[in-house]
A protein has these predicted regions:
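Small-residue-enriched flexible segments
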Residues: 1-127, 132-157, 162-185
Length: 185
């Protein structure tokens, strides 16, 4: 069993992509994407604004048939930039028209909850952990955060792995290259 902890939580409301070209998202819910983002920032509490300042992400819904979307229902990608001239955002993946997209923030508490929740279903005696070099002490207040949780999940059995700048693992039944994740086999 492979688990992928993306460690992000959705903020604001989900939007349907109404205008896009490859990874340039111009319209969300029939309005300019940057306008939607500006509203999100304006309405956010101070803690969420601080998390946004450290790095805002988008989640692309992997199963459009769900009645509501929660953490884990998204393929999380980074926001690469903005085109203020057309009110668009550029993201780290394609977002075809009709795709549901929601903004996300990453924080240590969510990342811990996400990893621990995913590891609860693991029944293994050993594990391989591939964790982003942007996690660890950059995200958590302790060293070896992910390795400790995985070790606990396998009952103290052997754990090996490495830091990565791009981890591979499944989300929505398909393998993807990720950033800022802990992918565990």
């Amino acid at each position: 069993l492979t688990v992928v902890s993306q460690g992000c939580r959705p903020v604001g409301e989900p939007y349907i992509v109404t205008d896009s070209e490859t990874n340039l998202v111009r319209g969300l819910g029939m309005r300019p994407a940057l306008e939607r983002l500006g509203e999100l920032v304006d309405d956010a509490d101070e803690e969420t604004k601080a998390l946004m300042a450290r790095g805002l992400h988008v989640g692309i819904v992997v199963d459009e048939s769900a009645d509501e979307f929660r953490r884990g229902d998204f393929l999380v990608r980074g926001i690469l930039g903005a085109d203020h001239g057309v009110g668009a955002i550029r993201i780290g993946d394609r977002a075809p028209i009709g795709t549901t997209l929601q903004f996300h923030v990453r924080d240590a508490e969510t990342a811990t909850e996400d990893l621990e929740s995913l590891l609860r279903v693991v029944d293994a005696d050993a594990a391989l952990v591939f964790t982003c070099n942007g996690r660890g002490h950059r995200l958590f207040s302790e060293a070896d955060h992910d390795a400790r949780r995985v070790s606990d999940a396998v009952g103290g059995g052997p754990v090996a792995g490495m830091f990565c700048a791009g981890e591979i693992g499944p989300v929505g039944g398909e393998n993807h290259v990720h950033g800022f994740t802990a992918s565990t086999l």
